[in-house]
């Protein structure tokens, strides 16, 4: 069964995005950013093994939520990028999944 947060998706307006981004980042200076119509954050790790472990858990979350980010992976970094293609913008689903990804490292 799909998560109810993903039902009736719509693109959020600019004010809603800014409000949600502020809530998501909290006190973090280098948290999620709005880049070219998507939520984006780069995570850093001590080595490739740790990076790939993170990628695998993000993949599990994405599959469970049926909401898949773009990932850019290098030796000690992974950039996660969420937007909702079917609404051509950022939706509540993006913020929901971004918060789940953040919780991995909390």
Regions found by a protein language model. Give the residues of each.
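Charge-rich alpha-helical segments
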Residues: 1-106
């Amino acid at each position: 069964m799909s998560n109810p947060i993903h039902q009736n998706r719509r693109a959020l307006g600019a004010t809603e995005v800014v409000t949600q981004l502020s809530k998501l980042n909290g006190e973090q200076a280098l948290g999620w950013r709005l880049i070219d119509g998507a939520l984006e954050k780069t995570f850093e790790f001590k080595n490739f093994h740790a990076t790939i472990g993170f990628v695998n858990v993000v993949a599990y979350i994405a599959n469970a939520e049926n909401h898949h980010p773009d990932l850019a992976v290098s030796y000690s970094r992974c950039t996660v990028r969420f937007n909702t293609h079917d609404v051509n913008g950022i939706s509540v689903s993006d913020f929901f999944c971004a918060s789940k990804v953040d919780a991995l490292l909390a």
